[in-house]
């Protein structure tokens, strides 16, 4: 894809993400597998522009939602994962699909070594919407730098 983003995102329930996922990234031994049934063929991710819509469509009002930030460069070059940009398919019969192409990961689970930042538990604002940190980087962090640079910690409401 031309102008591919440096990061891709996954919203997941806290139970899907080990508490030590950020620490385990240095070992290349633990991976994000996604949900059985939903992520059996590929793992669903979102771009920075799609995360808010994903949160509203599938996680509205939930208080145990984690944001995972994955570095595209590491997923492609070090984990050898295949990122395909495909149209959304409705999860339920009769449901309208979301617009645009979404990043789908083929080739196995995503090693936590591909994380660009520690997973974040998302808070809800007074309207019940998830509060997201600033998303999107110009350059993907390298694993040697630990993925901590480039994050100002700014928060945006969705």
Language-model segments: what does each one mean?
Residues 2-158:
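Conserved, structured core segments of small domains
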